[in-house]
Regions:
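N-terminal beta-loop-helix "entrance" segment that forms/cooperates
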Residues: 87-106
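FMN-binding flavodoxin-like domain, especially the glycine-rich phosphate-binding loop
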Residues: 1-82, 86, 107-110, 114-116, ...
Length: 187
């Protein structure tokens, strides 16, 4: 029995063998176009701009990660990619500290909960010129770990605004809802 899978883009639905999915997705979704957009983004002038890549996926089983690897392979050598994985219990969600407490920790460059956010994500976010979010669609929403990451960025935002950062995303969705996930990132 042949495994058949499908994917949808804004223009049409295509059917293909399972082993052909990623190469076909790569062509259909314009991985080259995404790589070109990252390379030509209006980054502030830097010798080698840094792109922070946030994900909560398994490298071995993730189509989202596979599409990112294809995109990264097409980026020029002028962009430094810093990948941070937010899975396996490394990230606690924001529990809604009182405003003054969040402000207190944020002004000192941290967060009450510490962890990977304070040790890796905050420093990388300060340095980077752009952020790439790798987002599989889970029930028309960002994954829990990516949502927790966005929530926890509030403390850093109190110290440093993100208006000069470019935002990119790879949203992988089985049938529908990818547009909803993308809107969550920009809202």
């Amino acid at each position: 029995m042949m495994n058949v899978a499908w994917f949808k883009n804004p223009d049409h639905v295509a059917y293909c063998k399972e082993e052909e999915i990623l190469p076909k997705l790569s062509r259909e979704l314009g991985i080259n176009d995404l790589a070109q957009r990252v390379e030509t983004a209006g980054f502030p002038p830097r010798e080698r701009p840094e792109l922070l890549v946030l994900h909560a996926s398994s490298h071995h089983t993730s189509n989202t990660m596979a599409l990112w690897e294809q995109t990264k392979a097409r980026l020029g050598g002028d962009i430094v990619c810093t990948e941070i994985g937010l899975r396996n219990g490394t990230l606690s969600d924001c529990s809604g500290c009182p405003y003054t407490m969040c402000l207190h920790f944020g002004e000192r460059g941290g967060c009450f909960y510490g962890g990977v956010m304070q040790e890796e994500v905050y420093p990388a976010m300060r340095r980077c010129a752009g952020v790439m979010m790798l987002c599989p669609n889970y029930n028309d929403a960002l994954s829990a770990n990516l949502t927790a990451c966005v929530n926890r960025l509030t403390a850093l935002f109190r110290q440093q605004r993100f208006y000069d950062k470019a935002l990119f995303a790879i949203v992988v969705s089985g049938y529908s809802g990818g547009d909803i996930v993308a809107r969550q990132l920009i809202d």
